[in-house]
Amino acid sequence: HATSTHLTPHVNAFDHYDVIMCAGPHQVQEIRRTEELKGLPPKELVEYGYDLMDKEIAAYSAMEHPPKGRPVVLIAPSWQEDNMLDLCIDEMLEQVIGRGYRIIVRPHPEYIKRYGARWEALQQRFASVPSDELYFESDFSSSDSIFAADVMVTDWSSISCEFSFTTLKPT
């Protein structure tokens, strides 16, 4: 992921490695500062980029972006404890359904894997809403919903980086 090295990993997660692959200069800066603060020996830091994001940026840039009939809201939460799907998704959806949006709920693939029954129950609770207004995405083989969205709502998933840096739209 392209996220920070100190936002989500364990506090000492990178301390004892000799070589670390870095998705960007922000990770290099964070690791160097951590080495300095903790008195750790310098590591070999390899800046390799973030292939997924590089490919998404290229694909999105090559696409045409015709005007849409209505704004698309992509709800794309993480899967860890206290994620939006478990805490507040019903209330969120109730606030936006019927207000002229196309809503896509795209959970992290791990959510469906671990919490399939919850995912199915959520879809059942909103089964009466037409799929052209509320769509529950479970095919993660493309980035189409990321590219189509006008805005993304997420918790602390790194998909926010993919969306905002690829489309230059708000998360």
Q: What function would you assign to each model-found segment?
A:
Residues 18, 71, 147-150:
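Conserved acidic residues
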Residues 27, 111, 158-159:
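Alpha-helix capping/helix-boundary segments
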Residues 46, 51-123:
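Conserved catalytic-core segment of nucleotide-activated headgroup transferases in glycan assembly
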Residues 119-138:
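Nucleotide-activated donor-binding/catalytic signature segment of Leloir-type glycosyltransferases, i.e.
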Residues 1-57:
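Active-site and donor-binding regions of nucleotide-sugar-utilizing enzymes
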Residues 13, 66, 95, 145-146:
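Structural alpha-helical scaffold elements that stabilize or flank donor/cofactor-binding regions
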